[in-house]
């Protein structure tokens, strides 16, 4: 998945469960993330990470921190709303 497609999909879903293959261990991992940094809670969190051409900066609710994620390693994006049963879209 390319960076633009990834950002468009995650932005459309709001909060999403993103499954990806770890670059270090090769294991499948997941995070509950958002690209919407407008909430006061997220704005109050410190961030030193900088997005580059290969990585996307996300806020992960399950780790309560920002993280850089490489879209090329993503295996699935599921909207959190579909898990909570207030939506039904899946990528």
Predicted feature residues:
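Charged, amphipathic alpha-helical segments
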Residues: 1-7, 31-45
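Short, 15-30-residue, compositionally biased linear elements
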Residues: 8-13, 51
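Ribonuclease/tRNase effector modules and their secretory precursors
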Residues: 1-5, 52, 77-90
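A short, Trp-centered hydrophobic/proline-enriched beta-strand micro-motif
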Residues: 12-22
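Structured surface patches comprising rigid loops and adjacent beta-strands/short helices at the edges
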Residues: 38-40, 64-83
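Intrinsically disordered, low-complexity regulatory segments
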Residues: 15, 90-91
């Amino acid at each position: 998945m390319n960076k633009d497609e990834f950002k468009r999909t995650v932005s459309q879903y709001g909060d999403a469960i993103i499954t990806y293959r770890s670059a270090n261990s090769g294991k499948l991992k997941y995070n509950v993330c958002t690209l919407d940094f407008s909430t006061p809670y997220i704005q109050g969190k410190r961030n030193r990470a900088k997005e580059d051409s290969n990585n996307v900066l996300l806020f992960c609710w399950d780790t309560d921190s920002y993280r850089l994620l490489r879209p090329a390693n993503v295996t699935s994006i599921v909207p959190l709303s579909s898990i909570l049963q207030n939506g039904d879209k899946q990528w």
